[in-house]
Design a protein with these regions (language model features):
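Alpha-helical transmembrane segments of compact multi-pass small-molecule transporters, enriched
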Residues: 39-45, 100-114, 195, 199, ...
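Hydrophobic core positions of alpha-helical segments in small-molecule transporters
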Residues: 9, 36, 100, 123-126, ...
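Membrane-interface helix-loop-helix junctions at boundaries between adjacent transmembrane segments
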Residues: 85-123
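Membrane-helix interface motif
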Residues: 50-56, 164-177
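Membrane-interface interhelical linkers
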Residues: 1-73, 80-92, 133, 141-160, ...
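Small-residue-mediated transmembrane helix hinge/kink sites in multi-pass secondary transporters
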Residues: 22, 86, 112-113, 170, ...
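Membrane-embedded alpha-helical core segments of multi-pass
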Residues: 13, 17, 77-84, 104-111, ...
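Hydrophobic transmembrane alpha-helices of multi-pass small-molecule transport proteins
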Residues: 45, 109-116, 123-141, 274-291
Length: 292
């Protein structure tokens, strides 16, 4: 059960990373802010992977074609998911953007059943539907809540893409070295972030060089986002190498109250009592899905 505290730590680092990324969103835009976590996270991910490789007894690496395919697919999906999540946060609020991303639980169930042949119980499906209903009510536009056009669509797209890339990363980690999940996960993070840095950095260099300039200007804040992003990814990948994605995502719902606290302290955002109630309903649904 060590994957549970690992997941809790991953959720905390992820909230810190999202807050740091959101702070550079204005000048760099969603794609520039997305590059922050990969470009400035890669040095930290490389150090983490190197240390893990050195301290792992008898590592047996298998960088096979399925490993590279899973890494490439997951990397592309995560880039799109991160940009969609930041767009949702920018058009609504930090906490609501994070809550919308949690719709990835239901998407994870759908992808698992359709693409990976997962056998899903009735309780798990019910929990997924309850969680989705709670999130829909939580994020429904209200008079006192700023919600610009496209926020919900971007948030749901983020959840769908994150759910699919999580399964890709789990497959990559298990393929690389299933006997050493932590080391395998950290090496996978390094490879994925290198691919993402090259792909997104090259894209911005050609299409939007001004965004690259803004990212470089915000290097102090970006270093914090990079470290937190590399730490969060390493912990998430490790937990998913030890346990199914659905269970990890269920425990990771702790990210929602953490995001609400962060949004209140850092961005002066507040959730209403009704939103908090529906947030709890969503959390109950997530727990049902995990325990089903």
């Amino acid at each position: 059960m060590i994957w549970i505290p690992i997941t809790l730590a991953a959720a905390a680092f992820q909230v810190a990373r999202n807050a740091a990324q959101r702070s550079v969103m204005g000048g760099a835009g969603p794609w520039g802010a997305t590059l922050v976590r990969f470009l400035f996270g890669l040095p930290f991910a490389t150090v983490f992977a190197g240390v893990a490789w050195c301290v792992t007894p008898g590592p047996s690496a298998h960088a096979s074609a399925p490993f590279w395919l899973a890494c490439i697919a997951g990397a592309a999906l995560q880039i799109c998911a991160t940009a969609a999540q930041l767009t949702a946060m920018h058009r609504s609020s930090f906490a609501l953007g994070t809550a919308l991303q949690q719709s990835g639980l239901l998407f994870a169930l759908v992808w698992g059943a359709l693409l990976f042949g997962d056998k899903v119980s009735a309780m798990t499906w019910t929990g997924g539907l309850v969680a989705t209903a709670g999130l829909a009510a939580l994020t429904w536009p209200r008079g006192g809540t700023p919600m610009r056009r496209g926020a919900v669509t971007a948030g749901l797209a983020s959840g769908a893409a994150f759910a699919l890339c999580a399964n890709c990363f789990r497959q990559a980690s298990l393929t690389f070295d299933p006997a050493h999940p932590a080391m395998s996960a950290l090496v996978t993070v390094m490879v994925v972030q290198a691919l993402q840095t090259l792909a997104l950095g090259g894209f911005l260099a050609v299409r939007n060089p001004d965004a690259l300039v803004e990212v470089v200007k915000a290097w102090r804040r970006s270093l914090g986002a990079g470290f937190c992003g590399a730490a969060a990814s390493g912990l998430w990948f490790t937990a998913m190498a030890m346990s199914p994605v659905g269970q990890v995502r269920a425990v990771g719902v702790v990210e929602m109250p953490l995001a609400a606290l962060a949004g209140r302290r850092l961005f002066a955002e507040r959730l209403t009592a009704v939103q908090m109630i529906f947030g709890l309903i969503a959390a109950v649904g997530v727990a049902m899905a995990a325990l089903g």
